[in-house]
Amino acid sequence: MGRGSFEIIKQIVDSILSTIYGIEEKCIICEEYEENDYICEKCKKSINIINIESSIIHEDEELKSYSLGFYGYELKKLILKLKYNKSFLAGKILASYMSEFILKNLKDKVDILTFIPSSKSALKNRGFNQCEVLCKYISKSCKIPYKELLYKASDSIDQIGLDNIKRWENIKDSFMVKNKKYIEGKRVLIIDDVITSGATAFYAAKAIKEINSDEVFILTVAKSRV
């Protein structure tokens, strides 16, 4: 059994114990006691969903990009809880906002979902890919199929801390495509957690476009202000 499966089972067990023994629930963000929901009303109102639409233009190509909001405050806290604290509840909450955006804006424009793959080292350390977690929840909510279409051909340096020029150089030619039969003639939506320079999204989309996909978009939880 993989570490990712173990963490999911642990979340389920914790939920069952909470129900049986009446363990107090806390707001996932501020950790104050919250009787009726996983997010208190104060934190819920502070989640700033503004639906950012932008274009990533590079090498004379354009990629349409969507993000729920900017990377900071409550959105950032939820992303970090999913990514580093292994809170699948945080992932489910974020995915619900992403699903709402898709149903309102992209439902008739998307045939299949996929996600940005983790490097082998990140997957080994974390035990799961947070983008895949989001993608699974979104697929179920929106009733859009998802498939693992990308993998990293080699482990690049972590993008965190690199300037924009080095980000583009570091990630170029990193992505390879699999399950090609699910791509040809399809409109593909790639799911990611945070977009910064756009280099990762651009080269992931470019790899898919080369397999005769009809169109490729990217949807992220947040967009960095950098």
How would you name each of these model-derived features?
Residues 1-192, 196-226:
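Glycine-rich phosphate/pyrophosphate-handling loop used in enzymes and phosphotransfer proteins
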